[in-house]
Amino acid sequence: MVVTRSGLSRTRLQESSQQKRSAPRRIGTHLESTKESGSDGSTAESQPAEKQHSRSSSRTTGPAEIIVLISDDEASETESHTSGVTSVLEDQEPIVRVTRKRQIVIASTSKSTVRKRQKVAPQHASADEVVVSEAESHVSGVSMVVPSTERSSRNKANSQRDSSQESQSGTVSDAELSCSGISSLEILPRTTARNVKKKLQFPAEKNDTKITPGNKKQIVGMSVCSEDSDATQLSARPLSQRNMPNVSDSETYNSDFDDSSPRNSGKKLTAQNHQNLHIQEEKRANVVSLTEVRKENCKSLDEEDLKITEEKVINEKDSQRSLSEAQDTSLQQSVSQNHSSTPNKKPTFQLSSPDRKALMKSLEHKFAVVNVERWNDKRGGSGKKSDLAQLGGGGGGGDDNEPTGAGISDDKSSQSGVPLECDTKPCKSELSMTQDTTDSPVLLFLSSDESQQSDSSENERDTLCSVENNGQKEASAEDLEDAACDSALFVIDKTPGLSADKNFYLEDKAPSEVAIEEEKEEEEKEEENSEEDSSDSDENKDESSDEEDLLSNTKSKLLKLTSSSIDPGLNIKQLGGLYINFNVDKLQPHKETLTQIKEKKKNELLQKAVITPDFEKKHCVPPYSESKHRLQKQRRKERQKTAGNGWFGMKAPELTDELKNDLRALKMRAGMDPKRFYKKNDRDGFPKYFQVGTIVDNPADFYHSRIPKKQRKKTIVEELLADSEFRRFNRRKYSEIMAEKAANAEGKKFKKKKKFRN
């Protein structure tokens, strides 16, 4: 319990003169020590020359100054001096010094006090929300119980006290003052958490809370938690944390209430304080009822948790049961329990398959909604009360700490009771449904909603599901393999001719044996049908069982159609099995052929291994020098194919008749045109590297004189023959040459005649 400065100031006015002097001196010395260690703005009052005088003067003049300021509706720093140790040591809120010289600052601090008064409302709202979240966490979480604390920022009920209680509060021991001083040192980390909590509050919660006037200075903060929550928190903690002392918890708890204490110490008590006493009694009664409900819920949840762990062991043993029976039994139990949990208590009755599916969907939806609300409340409570996670168990009190849940209005108590009832009903029904269900799949389905709060329980249930599914799959696969081996119509031989031990055909059975087998199958079917009728009713048969019946019927019909009833016209025995090979004798010694091929390869290798005079050339790697010369020769041949890098790697063309004629025409180019003179070509023969081409005029410059593509020729000779001027010149030259030859011939004839005449 933390007694603030305001309580001491009121008791000083009503007590004797001796008590007025004794108690303030002790508090003044403690206040001066704390000012020197933690405060920045108290230098004007703590000077070494006026230490003792400031103690007495500050206490005598405190109440008078407060009355003047409150009458003017203005806030001042003297309220903070008389409100408690926390107002002096708080660093994050700006401290305004009010001295004789600097009284102008009083008008500017009126806004800050209004803000502080407005911020009290979210604290009440957060306390109400914490109560609701705590109740939901006790009911919903089996494995995780999150104890939360209920802080009362303004204890209106404790403001009215008897004269005897006030006299006792005046004489406070030094130990309590030292505890309050220790708690005041921890204000700095707590103020940041309190500011964050104020930012997280919703604006709608401000309108719900009401602040009644009265003396709001004395604050008694007690944690609202039951013995069961203390036990669960101790079990959740490690052993090292259980044995440690709870000094830090009490210190931080006291610091929270020092931090949250308001500073309006000058207000007088009104007639509403008498009403607050009655309100406090009603609140305590409500809190006691809530704690009893929480105890009962926690005890029931612990019992149900033990039952669930026992059911897990039963589920592992019963994992080989079929899915259809589990669904039928679980659905009957769920329907009966659902009707029993309703307030009307209707008689139980069996539903058809579509109604059952609809009911399962509704159950899934209901459980999903419950889990979502629980998760949101859990997150909200943990986010807003993260710094008070260890206060419920660290308080150390059992039933002594429970009934002091002060600082809650009548509206809050009425509102906090409603969601508790609403939230506990679906959770209880859900847990009661999971108690009686012994079949594995449906129990896992229902318990999965509860296991969302703990990772370990989720992992265990997932492994159970996977083990059951794998077991069913393996059993079905083995059954299929056995059925395939026993009742196979044909067998595929992957290695024909080698495995002669297997029978590749079905032998013809006698008709008597076939009839006996059919009778046995019919008797087995009748026994199975009788067992199914005794175990399951006709209304609870699933579609899966019907499909299995159809498959078994079709399978029996197919088995009757054996090779004896069908005449293919071929005898499989004569053909050597399913592989119709007319040369069966050649395929039988297949292994011998493979061995013969291997022996031939060995013989060839042995023959090559014999030493002969030429074995060095055959089986030896050529030396490095020879290979180097060969590479040089190959490079030379490649170079000779082209004219070199100077001619851009021009290759030597193949000499054809057309190219030879072109080369001859180019040699005689001096006689083609008399107007042009060419140097005589000294080469004899044809060149090795050459390319023949024509120079084409630019069409933009010589458009009319250019040769179109249609008139262009492939070779030089064809172009010369197509040229008209060349043909005209060629004809004239040809006629001249022929005339000279004729003249020369006539002259020779005349000379011969003269010789004969002589």
UniProtKB/Swiss-Prot annotation:
It is found in: Nucleus; Nucleus, Nucleolus. There is a cross-link at residues 210, 317, 345, 384, 560, 586, 608, 628, 651, 660, 688, 733 (Glycyl lysine isopeptide (Lys-Gly) (interchain with G-Cter in SUMO2)). The modification Phosphoserine is found at residues 17, 133, 137, 140, 173, 183, 229, 240, 248, 255, 324, 330, 476, 512. Residues 128-143, 447-456 have a biased composition (Low complexity). One of its GO terms (cellular component) is nucleolus. The modification Phosphothreonine is found at residue 612. Residues 515-550 have a biased composition (Acidic residues). Residues 512-541 form a coiled coil. One of its GO terms (biological process) is ribosomal small subunit biogenesis. Its main location: nucleus. Residues 630-639 have a biased composition (Basic residues). InterPro entries: Fcf2/DNTTIP2, Fcf2_C. Residues 1-21, 155-172, 231-255, 321-353, 431-440 have a biased composition (Polar residues). Residues 550-607 are annotated as: TdBR region. The keyword DNA damage does not apply. Regulates the transcriptional activity of DNTT and ESR1. May function as a chromatin remodeling protein. Part of the small subunit (SSU) processome, first precursor of the small eukaryotic ribosomal subunit. During the assembly of the SSU processome in the nucleolus, many ribosome biogenesis factors, an RNA chaperone and ribosomal proteins associate with the nascent pre-rRNA and work in concert to generate RNA folding, modifications, rearrangements and cleavage as well as targeted degradation of pre-ribosomal RNA by the RNA exosome. This is Deoxynucleotidyltransferase terminal-interacting protein 2. It comes from Mus musculus (Mouse). The lineage of its organism: Eukaryota, Metazoa, Chordata, Craniata, Vertebrata.
